[in-house]
Amino acid sequence: MLTLSGCADFLDRDPLEQASANTFWKTEADVEKGVNALYPLLPGERDFWRDCESDNSLMTNSWGENGLGYICQGIHNAATGYLSEEWKYDHIYRILYCLDKLQGMEIKEEKKQRFEGEIRFILALKYYRMARHFGDIPLIKEKPVSLEEAALPRSPKQEVLDYAIENVNKAIEYLPETYSGDDVGRITKGAALMLKADMYLDMASYKKFHQGEEAKELWKEAASLAKKVIDLNLYGLENDFAFLFKAAANNNNKEVILAHQYMEDELTHMLPVLCSPSGVGVTGRGWASFCPTRDLVDSYEMTDGKTIYESSLYDMEHPWENRDARLKKTFMLPGVDILRPDGSYTPYMPHPAYNNPERINNEGGGITGYMYLKYNDLELEKVDASWTNFSLYRYAETLLIYAEALNEYEPYNAEIVWAVNQVRKRAGLPGVDSQLGNQERMRTIIREERRHEFVGEHKRYFDILRWKTAEVVLNQPGYGINKDEHTAIGDYTQEKFLGQERTFDPQKHYLWPIPQSARDKNPNLTQNPNW
């Protein structure tokens, strides 16, 4: 696995302080430590929290994590503290500082290019992510300077994306396809290709669904980039979906293309305690910080490929049977046996009538009646110190990017069903061969596959933004299980617990506001429309 112990030591000290004292950036080992220090800037497990920004999940605390809860409900403003979680010019400074120091180093060219590829990948990803949230943003290139010092105005979003693409192109050129030994887990050529494919998919979506313009060349490029990842012949789907989200899979699977790296007892995260309610797992500890919505749970298909509203297989008394296999591997579901602190397995029963620790609105009980198994190890003794890596890109996404892009510009291409069917086969679902050429239906299928495959991986929010469906799916409450405990738990016609009200204003919510704190320091920053 990627050795980050040097990184952890390095982060104990200020790298700028080290540089100014002329005690750093002398050797190849120094450069590697400097680059390692950038890896924690990659998106990590907190992206699981951010699935609450979509229609997949709700935060149990209406305020939540410095205002993330406000964003999730659509009641945030320019003063909301959580905006700074994505407005990351301190990260841009650190990345450019590292790049600037590298350029002046005399080390082996092959190593120098590899380090540059890693740095430029992280730089491209940071700018891409900020542009997705804020649209037009200041663009600082090559030389490290603070945003306040530069006092730059905002550059057009496309100019920012073009610069990000320039950087990811160099990453593709410089990065190796694979690593060995302690370097396994570092950023690869495949990861860089995935980032670029992701960017082109996003640009194509905005051009088509927001601007109503032809985007054929953008879709074509997204498909071509995904195909290049496929043609590397390095990746495949794991047979067991659940395995991917356990520590045993860390750098030990064929599907993950890039992940945020964690280490037992050194670099850890708290997803198990956040994903669990009270009373489950070997410790019984759980905060139920975020809960899946009824809409998400109900959207999983039956094994005949139909919805629960259409299929004759659906049984309200046994609603989790004959469903997409990912359903039981992603969620704790009412009535399904779950591990308890005494080692027994008893049904998870969150309805308040049962007075269990996991009951709705109990402290640590959640608000919808559903909880997460994904990224949650119920046998873990230290539930606030998980070391399961957090995936940024998986081969399943490669296949679905390929299928989505092909469907938009060449809907009769048989490669579409080839790609989609692989993902569906693992989930125990039938193929979609009969839908080839039905662009609208295939579009819906692919979108649902993305929703179910990437729960908790912070894909859904960006998807509903780029598809321009956020104004529909986020303008409705997030519901939970049925209120009447005497009705079948799968009876979707009954009144449900209201988890949270939500709102989405299409006149402004497709972009976040520029943080007021940033505008106070830089008067050249204008605000986004209607904020």
Regions from the PLM with identified roles:
Residues 1-6:
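Sec-dependent bacterial lipoprotein signal peptides
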Residues 8-68, 137, 161, 169-170, ...:
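An aromatic- and glycine-enriched ligand-binding surface/loop that stacks and positions planar moieties
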Residues 28-45, 65-134, 149-162, 168-182, ...:
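Conserved, well-structured interaction surfaces
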Residues 88, 163, 246-302, 385, ...:
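Long, intrinsically disordered, low-complexity segments
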Residues 111-117, 180-192, 242-244, 435-438:
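A glycine-rich, coil/turn loop motif that links secondary-structure elements
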Residues 320-423:
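C-terminal substrate/ligand-recognition segments
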